Amino acid sequence: MIYMLDTNIIIYLMKNRPKIIAERVSQLLPNDRLVMSFITYAELIKGAFGSQNYEQSIRAIELLTERVNVLYPNEQICLHYGKWANTLKKQGRPIGNNDLWFACHALSLNAVLITHNVKEFQRITDLQWQDWTK
């Protein structure tokens, strides 16, 4: 199984709070993969540039990416994005742009999106998601 961690889950994992996130990671099967979208990676880098200790933040991100692969766009992401951006707009229930990209990236890989932001992602009925903070 592919598990795509969104930004809030990655930050929880890096801070080891709540501890249940690390516990869930330790319970994964050998063939399971932890990945993050390039958008999550960009958000982490943005945070590092805004932090008081840039070098320490970048090093923490580098260590993280040794375990959690960064995945980059493919055509399928765009197809899912076009579908869901219009579907949600017609329903009058759009979600944030980055969240929509996360969801579409996970859909393109048939991955489970791991998030604490379930309210937004519940709107995308094709998406598999889990909240590992519970």
From Swiss-Prot:
Which key words are in the record?
Hydrolase, Magnesium, Metal-binding, Nuclease, Toxin-antitoxin system
The source's superkingdom equals Bacteria
Disulfide bridge positions per record: none
State where Mg(2+) binds. Answer: D6, D99
Task: Indicate yes or no for the key word Nuclease.
Answer: yes
Query: A GO molecular function for this record?
Result: RNA endonuclease activity
Please list which residues make up the signal peptide.
none
Say what the protein does.
Toxic component of a type II toxin-antitoxin (TA) system. Acts as an RNase, its toxic effect is neutralized by VapB1 antitoxin.
Read off the HAMAP family from this record: VapC_Nob1
Task: Give the protein name, as stated in the record.
Answer: Ribonuclease VapC1
Q: Report the source organism.
A: Haemophilus influenzae (strain ATCC 51907 / DSM 11121 / KW20 / Rd)
